[in-house]
From Swiss-Prot:
<feature type="short sequence motif" description="'KMSKS' region">
    <location>
        <begin position="334"/>
        <end position="338"/>
    </location>
</feature>
<keyword id="KW-0030">Aminoacyl-tRNA synthetase</keyword>
<comment type="similarity">
    <text>Belongs to the class-I aminoacyl-tRNA synthetase family. MetG type 1 subfamily.</text>
</comment>
<dbReference type="GO" id="GO:0005524">
    <property type="term" value="F:ATP binding"/>
</dbReference>
<keyword id="KW-0436">Ligase</keyword>
<dbReference type="InterPro" id="IPR001412">
    <property type="entry name" value="aa-tRNA-synth_I_CS"/>
</dbReference>
<keyword id="KW-0479">Metal-binding</keyword>
<dbReference type="InterPro" id="IPR029038">
    <property type="entry name" value="MetRS_Zn"/>
</dbReference>
<protein>
    <recommendedName>
        <fullName>Methionine--tRNA ligase</fullName>
        <ecNumber>6.1.1.10</ecNumber>
    </recommendedName>
</protein>
<dbReference type="InterPro" id="IPR023458">
    <property type="entry name" value="Met-tRNA_ligase_1"/>
</dbReference>
<dbReference type="GO" id="GO:0046872">
    <property type="term" value="F:metal ion binding"/>
</dbReference>
<dbReference type="InterPro" id="IPR014758">
    <property type="entry name" value="Met-tRNA_synth"/>
</dbReference>
<dbReference type="GO" id="GO:0006431">
    <property type="term" value="P:methionyl-tRNA aminoacylation"/>
</dbReference>
<dbReference type="InterPro" id="IPR041872">
    <property type="entry name" value="Anticodon_Met"/>
</dbReference>
<keyword id="KW-0648">Protein biosynthesis</keyword>
<feature type="binding site">
    <location>
        <position position="161"/>
    </location>
    <ligand>
        <name>Zn(2+)</name>
    </ligand>
</feature>
<feature type="binding site">
    <location>
        <position position="148"/>
    </location>
    <ligand>
        <name>Zn(2+)</name>
    </ligand>
</feature>
Length: 547
C-alpha cells in the first residue's frame, strides 16, 4: 500500500460561545473520522484547526458582557480545546488568530495581493449608527433576508438560506446595539478583485465533479451570476492592522484573514516540531491533497474566496476537496445556545460517554441534506448498534472462551466465505472513508457486525465443544478475526472504546499498525474484561441534561 501525505484543515470556530452539537456534525466529527482513518492506513496527515478570534461575534459578546474582546477570546479558546479533547478530537495544532505570527501572515497576503493587482482601494457604503456615533460592522446589523425573508439575517450572511449579504441588502435593517435604523454613508476601504479571478475559478471548479453534489451545486450557483470585488477591510479596531500608513482606524476583516489561519497553523506546527519548512510540503507539493471540512454556511468562503486568494498569491495548492455538511437541526430548528435550541457538547458529555455521542452523530451526519438530532434516537441507536450488535458479539465470544478456558490456535481462514465477506466489507468501508463518505462507512461496519453475529450463532460453539474440537477452534478463530476487522473499522468513530476492545482481544500489534497485519493469521491472547458499553435509557439521560 502506497502511503501519501494529506492536509486536513477544519473550520476555525468563533471564540464567542460554547460549541454545540451542530458544530460537531457540521465539520469536526467527519474530519476526525477521516483523519483517524487515514492514519490507520499509514498516511501522513497534518490536522489543523484553530480559534477565530477577530470576528465581530467576539466584539458583540464582549460589549454585552462588559469585557474586552481578548478576554472573551481567551475564555472560549480554552473552553473549545477542552470540549474537543473530551470528545476525542485532537488536532495537531489549534492555532489562534490573535497570535502575532498570524497577523504577519495575514499582512503578507494583503501586501502580496495588493502588489499583484488583486486588491485595490475604493469606497463603499457602510452602516453608520448615529446614536452610537460610528460605522457598524456587518454583524452589528440585522434585518430580513431579501431572498428567503428570514427575519434574523445578519449584515454579512443569512444563516437560513446561506446567501452572503451586505447590510444594505437587508429589509428593515437595525443596529443590534441601539435598535436604531442605520444611515448608509460612504467610507474608504480595500477590495479583493474576485472578478479578475473568475475565469480561473470557473476552470478549477469544472474539475471538481467528485465533490458532494450539494457543495458543487452551491458553488456553481454562487459563481454563475458573476463575481464582484469584495471589501476586505472594515471600520473597526479589533482585528489585524492594515500594513499601510493612514489606516489606523480600520482593520483587515475577519473573513479574509481567518482563512489564512490554516497556513499560520501549519507554519507554527512546523516550527514546534523542529522542521520550519515542513508546512511547504503540505501546501506546495502538488501531490499532497488538501481537504477543508466546514459547515454549509462556509462554502462560499472556502470554495470561492480562499481559492481566489491562493491563486492571486501564487505557489499554493488549491483545495482538493471541500466536504461541507448541511445543517444538523433540533426539532427542525438550527441549534442555538443563545435561543435555547438544542444542547451544547459539554451538556451532552455530562450525560453520555463521548463515544456514544460520536457514534450517534456519525450515524446522522448531514452529509448531503439536513438531519435532525433526537435524544430518543440517540438512545435507540446506541443501544441497538453499539451494545446489542457489537458489544454483545464481543461479550459472547470472550465469555464463552473464558468459561471453557479456550484460546483458539491460529488457523488459515483466508479462504472461508465469512472471512472473504469481512475483507470485502473492509475494502468497501475503505473506499467510503477515502472518499469522505463517513456515514456510509458506518453502515458498512454495521452490516458486518450483523453478519458476524449471524455467523457466531450458526457456528454453535456450545455444541461443537462437545463433539468437534477442530471445528470449534476454526470457528472461534474466525469469529475473532472478523471481530478484529470490525474493531479496526469502528476505531475512527469510537476510538476509546475500540482500543479497549482491541486490547481485550490481545492482538499482538497496536491498532494503529493494523493495516499492515489485518489479514495475518496471528495468535490472540484474549483476556476477558468489562465490555466498554452500558445501555442507556431516555429518562436518566434527560434527567442528567436537566441537572
Amino acid at each position: 500500500m502506497v502511503q501519501i501525505k494529506i492536509l486536513v484543515n477544519c473550520a476555525l470556530p468563533y471564540a464567542n460561545g460554547p460549541l454545540h452539537i451542530g458544530h460537531i456534525a457540521g465539520a469536526y466529527l467527519g474530519a476526525d473520522v477521516f483523519v483517524r482513518y487515514n492514519r490507520l492506513m499509514g498516511n501522513q496527515v497534518l490536522y489543523v484547526s484553530g480559534s477565530d478570534e477577530y470576528g465581530t461575534p467576539i466584539t458583540v459578546r464582549a460589549e454585552k458582557e462588559g469585557r474586552s474582546p481578548k478576554e472573551i477570546a481567551d475564555i472560549y479558546y480554552e473552553e473549545h480545546l477542552r470540549t474537543f479533547e473530551n470528545l476525542g478530537i485532537s488536532f495537531d495544532i489549534f492555532m489562534r488568530t490573535t497570535w502575532p505570527e498570524h497577523s504577519e501572515n495575514a499582512q503578507d497576503f494583503f501586501i502580496k495581493l495588493l502588489n499583484e493587482g488583486y486588491i485595490e482601494k475604493g469606497t463603499m457604503i457602510a452602516p453608520f449608527c448615529r446614536k452610537i456615533g460610528r460605522f457598524m460592522p456587518d454583524r452589528y446589523i440585522e434585518g430580513t433576508c431579501p431572498y428567503c425573508h428570514y427575519p434574523k439575517a445578519r449584515g454579512d450572511q443569512c444563516d437560513n438560506c446561506g446567501r452572503t449579504l451586505d447590510p444594505q441588502d437587508l429589509i428593515d435593517p437595525k443596529c443590534i446595539l441601539s435598535g436604531e435604523t442605520p444611515e448608509f454613508r460612504e467610507t474608504e476601504h480595500f477590495f479583493l478583485r474576485l472578478d479578475l479571478l473568475e475565469d480561473r475559478l470557473k476552470s478549477w471548479i469544472s474539475s471538481k465533479n467528485f465533490w458532494k453534489p450539494n457543495v458543487l451545486a452551491y458553488t456553481q450557483n454562487f459563481i454563475s451570476g458573476g463575481l464582484k470585488k469584495r471589501p476586505i477591510t472594515r471600520d473597526i479596531d479589533w482585528g489585524v492592522k492594515i500594513p499601510l500608513d493612514g489606516y489606523d482606524s480600520k482593520r483587515i476583516y475577519v473573513w479574509f484573514e481567518a482563512l489564512i489561519g490554516y497556513i499560520t497553523g501549519a507554519k507554527e506546527y512546523s516550527k514546534r516540531t523542529g522542521n520550519p519548512d515542513l508546512w511547504k510540503e503540505y501546501y506546495m507539493d502538488p501531490e499532497v491533497r488538501n481537504y477543508y471540512f466546514i459547515g454549509k454556511d462556509n462554502i462560499p468562503f472556502h470554495a470561492i474566496i480562499w481559492p481566489a486568494m491562493l491563486m492571486g498569491y501564487g505557489g499554493f495548492n488549491l483545495p482538493y476537496d471541500i466536504p461541507a455538511n448541511e445543517y444538523l437541526t433540533f426539532k427542525g430548528q438550527q441549534f442555538s445556545k443563545s435561543r435555547g435550541i438544542g444542547y451544547s457538547v459539554d451538556d451532552l458529555l455530562k450525560a453520555v460517554p463521548a463515544d456514544y455521542l460520536r457514534y450517534y452523530v456519525a450515524s446522522i451526519l448531514p452529509e448531503t441534506g439536513d438531519s435532525d438530532f433526537s435524544l430518543e434516537e440517540l438512545v435507540n441507536t446506541v443501544n441497538s448498534d453499539l451494545i446489542d450488535k457489537y458489544g454483545n458479539l464481543v461479550y459472547r465470544i470472550l465469555s464463552f472462551m473464558d468459561r471453557y478456558s479456550i484460546n483458539p490456535d491460529p488457523v488459515d481462514v483466508s479462504g472461508d466465505e465469512e472471512f472473504k465477506y469481512a475483507q470485502r466489507s473492509f475494502e468497501l468501508w475503505s473506499e467510503d472513508l477515502s472518499g469522505v463518505h463517513v456515514k456510509r462507512g458506518l453502515l458498512r461496519w454495521l452490516d458486518l457486525a450483523i453478519y458476524a453475529n449471524g455467523f457466531f450463532n450458526r457456528s454453535e460453539p456450545w455444541k461443537t465443544i462437545k463433539n468437534d474440537r477442530q471445528k470449534l477452534n476454526h470457528d472461534l478463530y474466525l469469529s475473532l478475526k472478523i471481530t478484529e476487522v470490525l474493531t479496526v473499522m469502528v476505531y475512527p468513530y469510537i476510538p476509546s472504546s475500540a482500543e479497549k476492545i482491541w486490547n481485550m482481544l490481545g492482538i499482538p500489534f497496536a491498532i494503529g499498525q493494523s493495516y499492515r497485519h489485518l489479514y495475518e493469521m496471528h495468535a490472540f491472547s484474549v483476556h476477558r474484561g468489562a465490555i466498554p458499553f452500558e445501555k442507556i435509557d431516555l429518562e436518566s439521560l434527560v434527567s442528567k441534561l436537566n441537572n
